[in-house]
């Protein structure tokens, strides 16, 4: 254990700065970055993986800022809700989830049906249709006599007219299980709102609870009619499946309703509709008295009368908590666009600052899109951080530069190059100030973005990439090894001479080449 403790130890997160071998359409590789070039040539450096299972996401899925900062601060792989549920299905524990079993049993005892609703999509952003199939299987295995699916169609995280293919595949899965019927279909536009457009949510409610929609014999027939009317999946008008003119699967008293979206933001409103004791946005005609309402994950702490199949997992002994336990002080600094990431997400989803934790917020510029001002507020952020650390002796400083990600999202190559050059300049200023104070710096990123500005079809690439992030150490003689984002916190603890808690299963990536002097 190294006994030397640099002060301040500084973690700089370059949001959206990925490493990509190809220079073509790579704003990072083609920008003038004398400081980063020098460090990558002459200082200890390595790469950390930022996507897929390495950050708790499914294989091949790009990382994002929220996931990246969770892993950076936790010092362990933080499995996201999608992956938690998928892993539970793979290992069989999903079929024994007590919340699901109790909800199914409650419907059985009341003589009711089990209803599943959610985004029927393989997109993996809000839900996954394979997880809905698993829930059908669970309901069947536990004695549900009637199982109905209320399918919300995607078209945003999937191609705009792909629902026919996915519905066909889903119904083939139902046939193999010998259980479950699609009772209603509508585009996500009508139910998955998050901006209090209650007229849309009401149409989704009335479809499921009252059977108010255009009647069709099958889900695929409803989708084909929508395509014939030039509707895309997201905007498919509410449709109800009927037999002899009557809806086959309205939600009635005694039934159980299970929402199968793992992402919370777009099912909060519809969940409040079905469960709130008092509700003002619209009159809930025919509100069913449910045996149970299950949220796959936690959607909203204010929801009443709900059960949560996969509640949040509390993270203990994360980096910020370890600092507090040792009586050390910290500063978290970012401009508005990434402030929540270096605070809330870096702290494992905790809103309040920890003991000894100060925060510094610099306003992001008020422009329509950041290609109009690619420098953003990087210079002011650097000024404020230098001023703060020169007046207050912090032990740990965490700084996020938002430019590579926020300008990368615009898809404007020239602006992204300017953003990268701005960050390199400000990095030089910040690191000079820290080193002059006797501090050390660890530089990394949460995911890639500006490293690819044009896609394979020649159009603007505005999404994150799967590429690794740099890891650069400005300090003592040492070597760095490749790893993943969850290894950064253990590396910081090693650099600070602090023990790593058992809960952190990441590993330190630093190896000192000579003993430190206390």
Swiss-Prot record:
PANTHER family: 2,3-BISPHOSPHOGLYCERATE-INDEPENDENT PHOSPHOGLYCERATE MUTASE. Pathway: Carbohydrate degradation; glycolysis; pyruvate from D-glyceraldehyde 3-phosphate: step 3/5. Mn(2+) 2 binds at residues 15, 65, 446-447. HAMAP family: GpmI. Monomer. InterPro entries: Alkaline_phosphatase_core_sf (IPR017850), BPG-indep_PGM_N (IPR011258), Metalloenzyme (IPR006124), PGAM_B_sf (IPR036646), Pgm_bpd_ind (IPR005995). One of its GO terms (molecular function) is phosphoglycerate mutase activity. Substrate binds at residues 126, 156-157, 188, 194, 263-266, 338. Catalyzes the interconversion of 2-phosphoglycerate and 3-phosphoglycerate. CDD domains: iPGM. Keywords: Glycolysis, Isomerase, Manganese, Metal-binding. It catalyses: (2R)-2-phosphoglycerate = (2R)-3-phosphoglycerate. The active site is at residue 65. One of its GO terms (cellular component) is cytosol. Belongs to the BPG-independent phosphoglycerate mutase family. Transmembrane segments: none annotated. This is 2,3-bisphosphoglycerate-independent phosphoglycerate mutase.
């Amino acid at each position: 254990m190294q006994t030397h403790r640099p002060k301040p130890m500084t973690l700089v997160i370059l949001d959206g700065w990925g490493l990509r071998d190809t220079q073509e359409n790579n704003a990072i590789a083609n920008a003038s970055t004398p400081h980063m070039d020098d460090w990558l040539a002459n200082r200890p450096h390595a790469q950390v993986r930022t996507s897929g299972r390495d950050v708790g996401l499914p294989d091949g899925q790009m990382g994002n800022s929220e996931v990246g900062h969770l892993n950076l601060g936790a010092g362990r792989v933080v499995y996201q809700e999608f992956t938690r549920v998928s892993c539970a299905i793979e290992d069989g524990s999903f079929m024994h989830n007590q919340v699901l079993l109790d909800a199914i049993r409650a419907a059985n005892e009341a003589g009711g049906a089990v209803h599943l609703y959610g985004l029927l999509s393989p997109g993996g952003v809000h839900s996954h249709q394979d997880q809905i199939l698993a829930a059908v299987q669970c309901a069947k295995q536990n004695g549900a006599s009637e199982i109905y699916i209320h399918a919300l169609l995607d078209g945003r995280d999937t191609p705009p007219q792909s629902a026919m293919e996915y519905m066909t595949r889903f119904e083939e899965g139902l046939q193999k299980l010998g259980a479950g019927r699609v009772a209603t279909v509508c585009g996500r536009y009508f139910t998955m709102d998050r901006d209090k457009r209650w007229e849309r949510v009401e149409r989704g409610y009335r479809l499921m609870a009252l059977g108010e929609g255009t009647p069709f014999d099958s889900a695929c027939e409803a989708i084909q009619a929508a395509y014939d009317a030039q509707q895309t999946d997201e905007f498919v008008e509410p449709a109800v499946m009927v037999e002899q003119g009557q809806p086959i699967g309205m939600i009635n008293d005694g039934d159980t309703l299970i929402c199968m979206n793992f992402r919370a933001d777009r099912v909060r409103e519809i969940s409040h509709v079905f469960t709130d004791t008092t509700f003002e946005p619209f009159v809930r005609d025919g509100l069913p008295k449910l045996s149970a309402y299950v949220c796959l994950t936690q959607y909203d702490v204010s929801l009443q009368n709900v059960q949560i199949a996969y509640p949040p997992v509390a993270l203990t002994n994360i980096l910020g908590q370890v600092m507090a336990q040792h009586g050390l002080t910290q500063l978290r600094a970012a401009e508005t666009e990434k402030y929540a990431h270096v605070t809330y997400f870096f702290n494992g989803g905790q809103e309040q600052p920890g003991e000894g934790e100060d925060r510094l917020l610099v306003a992001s510029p008020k422009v329509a899109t950041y290609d109009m001002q690619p420098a953003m507020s990087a210079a002011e952020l650097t000024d404020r951080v230098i001023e703060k650390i020169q007046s207050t002796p912090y032990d740990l400083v965490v700084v996020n530069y938002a430019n590579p990600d926020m300008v990368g999202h615009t898809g404007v190559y020239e602006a992204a190059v300017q953003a990268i050059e701005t960050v390199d300049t400000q990095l030089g200023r910040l690191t000079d100030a820290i080193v002059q104070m006797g501090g050390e710096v660890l530089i990394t990123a949460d995911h890639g973005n500006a490293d690819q500005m044009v896609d394979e079809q020649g159009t603007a690439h505005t999404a994150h990439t799967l590429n690794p992030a740099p890891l650069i150490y400005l300090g003592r003689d040492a070597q760095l090894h490749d790893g993943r984002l969850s290894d950064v916190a253990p590396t910081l603890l090693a650099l600070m001479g602090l023990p790593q808690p058992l809960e952190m299963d990441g590993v330190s990536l630093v190896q000192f080449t000579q003993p430190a002097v206390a």
